Design a protein with these regions (language model features):
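Acidic, PIN/NYN-like endoribonuclease modules and their adjacent C-terminal/linker elements
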Residues: 1, 104, 108-135
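Short, well-structured N-terminal submotif of metal-dependent ribonuclease cores
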Residues: 1-36, 48-64
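Histidine- and aromatic-rich ligand-binding microenvironments
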Residues: 5, 37, 95-97, 118-119
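Alpha-helix capping/helix-boundary segments
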Residues: 8-9, 40, 78, 103, ...
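Residues at the C-termini of beta-strands that transition into short coil/loop
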Residues: 38, 75, 134
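Active-site neighborhoods of divalent-metal-dependent phosphate/nucleic-acid chemistry enzymes
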Residues: 70-115
Length: 135
C-alpha cells in the first residue's frame, strides 16, 4: 500500500521525472493499492484553485485521480497518531510541518509506504516507511 505525497503527485502530473512516471505506471499496472491522503488532496485542490488555469488543471487532476484507489479521509485515529508523531518529533528537536505530520500519521497507522521526493523530512518519523520513486 502506497500513499503519495503532494510533491510526487505534481511531478507525475507534470511528467518531470521519467523514472517516477514509469514506476507509477508500473505500480498501477500491477494493481498496487495507491492512495492519497485527504490532506494531499486539499493541497492539490488549493494549487489548482490558485493557478492561472484552474479549469485545465482541475481536468488534469481529475485524470490523474482515475487510477488512484481512494482518497483517505483524516479521521479520529489519524489525529491521535499525528499527535503522537508531532510530540515525539518536537521532543527530538526535529519537527516537521503540520500537514506532513498528518500525512505521515495516515501512512504509518495503515503501515503504508509514503512516496515522496522529500525523504529527509519524512525519515524523521519513527516507524514510517518512506520511498522516493524518482531515484
Amino acid at each position: 500500500m502506497y500513499f503519495l505525497d503532494t510533491n510526487i503527485v505534481i511531478k507525475i502530473m507534470l511528467r518531470q521525472s521519467e523514472t517516477l512516471v514509469a514506476r507509477f505506471e508500473d505500480e498501477i499496472e500491477r494493481g498496487s493499492p495507491i492512495f492519497l491522503s485527504s490532506i494531499v488532496f486539499y493541497e492539490l485542490a488549493y494549487g489548482v484553485s490558485k493557478s492561472a488555469h484552474p479549469k485545465r488543471n482541475f481536468d488534469r487532476l481529475s485524470e490523474f485521480l482515475t487510477p488512484i484507489a481512494d482518497i483517505i479521509a483524516f479521521d479520529r485515529d489519524d489525529a491521535l497518531e499525528a499527535g503522537d508523531i508531532r510530540a515525539e518529533l518536537e521532543r527530538q528537536g526535529f519537527p516537521i510541518g503540520p500537514y506532513d505530520v498528518q500525512i505521515a500519521a495516515q501512512a504509518r497507522r495503515r503501515k503504508a509506504v509514503i512516496v515522496t521526493n522529500n525523504r529527509r523530512k519524512f525519515n524523521r518519523v519513527p516507524g514510517l516507511m518512506v520511498a522516493d520513486w524518482t531515484e
